[in-house]
A protein has these predicted regions:
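Short, glycine-biased loop/turn motifs at secondary-structure junctions and
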Residues: 1-323
Length: 323
C-alpha cells in the first residue's frame, strides 16, 4: 500500500467520487488504497491484477491532470519500468504468452502465435530482432531485446520497448507507447495516445489527435502533425517540429529548437533555446523568431502569442509568484 506525498502524483477516493467512477472500480480502490495511492503504486496494482479495462481511463486522467508537472516524466519512467518488472522473471528467455485468469492456459513452447479473436494477452520477449504484429485490444506487450519491432492496430494496448534501436508503429487509438532504449523510432497515427521515450537520439513522428508526447533525453527529434497535441521535450540539443493546431510545445532542454507552422497554443524554451513560429498577417504567412534570453523570453516559462504576435507569459492558476 502506498500513501501519497506532495512530491508524487496521487489519487484519492475523493478524486474518484468527483469523477463518478463505476461502483466496482470505487470498491476496488477502497480495498487496496483506502488512504489514497501514488500513480506508480495504483498502476502497478492494476497490472498485477490484469485490470486492463481500467488502466486506459486511469492513465488518461493522470495525463490530463499532471502532464505539465515538473516531476511527471520521472514518475512516468518509474511506471514503465514497473510494467517490465511485473510481467515476470527478468531472467526468463524467449517469448512468453500469458492469458488472463478467465482464459484457458495456452502452450508456452511456441515462438509464434496467431490469433483472430483472443484479446488481453500478456506478451514478453527478451530476444533480439523480434518482430510482432498485434491487432487485438487491451494487450500488454514488453520487449527488452535490441532492434525489436512492434506493429499495432488494436485499441487500448500497452506497448513497452526497452532495447536499443527499437521500433514501434501504432495506428490504434487510446494506446500507450513506452520506449526506454536509445535510438528508438516511434511512428503513431492513433488518437488519444500517450508516448513516452527516455533514450538518447529517439525519433518520434505523430499524426494522431489529442496525443501526449514526452522525450526526456538528449538529441531527440519529434515531429507532430496532429491537432491538440501536448509535446514535452526535456533533453538537450533536441528539436520539436509541429504543424498541428492548438498544440502546446515545450522544449526545455538546453540549446533545443521549436518550429511550428500550426496555430500554436503555447510554447516554452530552455536555456539557449529558440522558437520559429508561423502566423498569418492577413495577407501572407510570416514567421516570428524567439530566442531564450532575448525580448523577455525566460527559460522554463510558457508563452502564448497575442493578436499582435507578442509573447505573453502564461501564469498558472494558484501561482504565488510571477517572474
Amino acid at each position: 500500500m502506498s500513501v501519497p506525498s506532495k512530491e508524487n502524483i496521487s489519487l484519492t477516493k475523493e478524486d474518484l467520487r468527483q469523477l463518478h467512477v463505476s461502483t466496482s472500480l470505487y470498491r476496488w480502490f477502497l480495498r487496496y488504497f483506502p488512504d489514497g495511492g501514488t500513480y506508480s503504486a495504483i498502476h502497478s496494482e492494476l497490472i498485477k491484477q490484469r485490470r486492463t479495462q481500467w488502466i486506459e481511463s486511469f492513465i488518461q486522467y493522470i495525463y490530463l491532470r499532471h502532464f505539465s508537472d515538473a516531476s511527471f516524466a520521472k514518475q512516468e519512467q518509474e511506471v514503465m519500468e514497473n510494467i517490465l518488472f511485473l510481467l515476470g522473471n527478468e531472467q526468463q528467455q524467449g517469448v512468453t504468452l500469458q492469458r488472463l485468469p478467465y482464459h484457458n492456459t495456452l502452450p508456452t513452447s511456441e515462438n509464434i502465435q496467431f490469433s483472430t479473436e483472443w484479446h488481453q494477452l500478456i506478451l514478453k520477449s527478451q530476444q533480439l530482432s523480434t518482430d510482432l504484429a498485434l491487432c487485438g485490444n487491451n494487450n500488454i506487450v514488453a520487449f527488452s531485446g535490441d532492434e525489436n519491432s512492434i506493429s499495432n492496430t488494436g485499441y487500448s494496448n500497452q506497448l513497452m520497448n526497452t532495447g536499443f534501436a527499437g521500433k514501434v508503429c501504432n495506428t490504434g487509438n487510446q494506446c500507450r507507447i513506452g520506449s526506454l532504449g536509445g535510438r528508438s523510432r516511434i511512428c503513431n497515427s492513433g488518437n488519444d495516445v500517450k508516448i513516452y521515450a527516455s533514450g538518447n537520439g529517439v525519433h518520434i513522428a505523430n499524426s494522431g489527435m489529442r496525443n501526449f508526447i514526452t522525450a526526456s533525453q538528449d538529441r531527440a527529434k519529434v515531429t507532430n502533425t496532429g491537432d491538440l497535441a501536448q509535446i514535452n521535450v526535456t533533453g538537450n540539443n533536441s528539436v520539436a517540429i509541429n504543424t498541428g493546431d492548438n498544440c502546446k510545445v515545450t522544449v526545455s532542454g538546453d540549446d533545443s529548437i521549436c518550429i511550428s507552422t500550426g496555430d500554436l497554443h503555447q510554447f516554452c524554451l530552455g536555456k539557449g533555446g529558440s522558437a520559429v513560429i508561423a502566423y498569418h498577417d492577413g495577407n501572407r504567412t510570416r514567421f516570428k523568431i524567439f530566442y531564450e534570453g532575448e525580448d523577455g523570453i525566460i527559460a522554463g516559462v510558457h508563452y502564448y502569442l497575442d493578436e499582435n504576435q507578442h509573447p505573453v507569459a502564461h501564469i498558472k492558476q494558484n501561482s504565488t509568484s510571477v517572474n
